[in-house]
């Protein structure tokens, strides 16, 4: 439950859900039930919650890494993990408001704002995102589903650190 949280971090995602239960599907469909899966976030009525994050961490599969001639930068590699959202879940994430849906979640991110590796469902609350890249990103290739059932979303993307999609589900 977010109840007046004020979290800032410059060396990792400001909020990260790493070990959470995942739903029993590995295919994208119109009716993926994420209600009991992943991180379940509740934005408490009448509260303002501030989340600020700016860090991008990439962990590569060692056998795929190709370095430049000076051996100082990665030129090509397949990612094992990439943590680049200010508010991030390694699995699915559900965001809910309480009865009045009057709670506010403000996310400021140098890169991705609200980021889920699997499915993301927004059911309520007032969510304001300002990001340098994607405002909302779900990114498990061919599997991720982004669903907005309720609430109010305001997304401002600067494009400072990427192409800058409002909502990117890839």
Walk through the language-model features, giving the residues of each:
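A composition-driven surface/loop motif
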Residues: 1-170
């Amino acid at each position: 439950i977010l109840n007046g949280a004020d979290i800032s971090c410059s060396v990792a995602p400001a909020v990260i859900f790493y070990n959470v239960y995942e739903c029993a599907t590995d295919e994208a469909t119109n009716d993926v039930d994420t209600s009991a899966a992943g991180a379940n976030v509740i934005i408490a009525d009448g509260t303002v919650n501030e989340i600020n994050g700016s860090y991008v961490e990439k962990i590569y599969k060692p056998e795929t890494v190709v370095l430049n001639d000076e051996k100082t930068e990665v030129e090509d590699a397949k990612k094992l993990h990439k943590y680049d959202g200010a508010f991030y879940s390694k699995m699915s994430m559900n965001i809910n408001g309480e009865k009045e849906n009057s709670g506010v979640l403000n996310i400021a991110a140098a890169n991705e704002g609200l980021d889920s590796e699997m499915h993301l469902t927004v059911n309520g609350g007032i969510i304001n995102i300002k990001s340098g890249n994607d405002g909302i990103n779900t990114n498990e290739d061919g599997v991720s589903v982004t669903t907005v059932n309720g609430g109010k979303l305001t997304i401002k993307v600067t494009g400072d650190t990427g192409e800058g999609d409002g909502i990117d589900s890839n």
